[in-house]
Amino acid sequence: MKREELLVEEIKDLTLEELKGYADFYKILDKVYGFTAESVVRGVKILKDMIKEADLRFLSFTANLVSTGLRGLFADLIKQGYFNVIITTGGTIDHDIARSFGGKYYKGLFEYDDSMLRELEIHRLGNILVPMESYGKVIEDVVRKYMNEIVSIKKEWPVYELLWEFGKRISDENSILKAAYEKKVPIIVPGIIDGSFGTNLFIYSQFTQLKLNLFEDMKLIKDLIFSCKKSGALIIGGGISKHHTIWWNQFKDGLDYAIYITTAQEYDGSLSGAKPREAISWNKIKPTSENVVIYGDATIILPILSASLLG
């Protein structure tokens, strides 16, 4: 196949506005009830309770979702004040910057020949196609363009403040970084160096006095945890973003509300597959908490949960 035959239909971001007509869709699932439908309905109830009752509300997600149309939905959830702390992975920053500064991602298929894609200089992320020129070079150019100006302000940065500086310089209304900057919602990325953005910061630091101070990010979370009355989390996916969220909540005896959206299973003992009941044994979720695991693809589940907030 030719490159132009593959890169046809661009990924577009979803907004809360587009979900207005689906606010009651979860009620249909409540009629169906069986199996996953029940857990989605329970998730809607817990999410609404959390937003109403918890003063500290975490949104935790993995980077792969930012390559999809969920990126715009994440931005809107921040803009509307539903969440006031974001915990995510290094790739989230990569994809958000790449797409904010002209990078285009395209619809594809899982089944494409990856050797062919490599020859055509196209990355594959599941069934999403990322032209090479839409990813690494875009991020490298953005870091090079803005870092001299940012380092002239100060040389040592907490990661969340550095990300606000980049968000300040983004005009794309679907950007997660822009939304977080405008609402002053901290984005905590414990694995910031694991990705293109972090690697470019490292390279830049070799020629300047740039320093990242992750302890300041930890201090911020510590202060938020110890000052809150109730905390809740919508945790999408697993890995470091999930663990960092529940880890810090053990210091207040656990989350009061927890919603997991996952496809991971617990039989292998992984953190990603661990259910809320296991986190209870670690004091990361309260025994009295409202909690649920929703098994399914977040690109389907999250729009349903988000739409319910509009009803």
From Swiss-Prot:
<dbReference type="InterPro" id="IPR036982">
    <property type="entry name" value="Deoxyhypusine_synthase_sf"/>
</dbReference>
<keyword id="KW-0386">Hypusine biosynthesis</keyword>
<keyword id="KW-0808">Transferase</keyword>
<dbReference type="InterPro" id="IPR022899">
    <property type="entry name" value="Deoxyhypus_synthase_arc"/>
</dbReference>
<dbReference type="GO" id="GO:0034038">
    <property type="term" value="F:deoxyhypusine synthase activity"/>
</dbReference>
<protein>
    <recommendedName>
        <fullName>Probable deoxyhypusine synthase</fullName>
        <ecNumber>2.5.1.46</ecNumber>
    </recommendedName>
</protein>
<comment type="pathway">
    <text>Protein modification; eIF5A hypusination.</text>
</comment>
<dbReference type="InterPro" id="IPR029035">
    <property type="entry name" value="DHS-like_NAD/FAD-binding_dom"/>
</dbReference>
<feature type="active site" description="Nucleophile">
    <location>
        <position position="284"/>
    </location>
</feature>
<dbReference type="GO" id="GO:0005737">
    <property type="term" value="C:cytoplasm"/>
</dbReference>
<keyword id="KW-0520">NAD</keyword>
<comment type="similarity">
    <text>Belongs to the deoxyhypusine synthase family.</text>
</comment>
<dbReference type="InterPro" id="IPR002773">
    <property type="entry name" value="Deoxyhypusine_synthase"/>
</dbReference>
<dbReference type="Pfam" id="PF01916">
    <property type="entry name" value="DS"/>
</dbReference>
<comment type="function">
    <text>Catalyzes the NAD-dependent oxidative cleavage of spermidine and the subsequent transfer of the butylamine moiety of spermidine to the epsilon-amino group of a specific lysine residue of the eIF-5A precursor protein to form the intermediate deoxyhypusine residue.</text>
</comment>
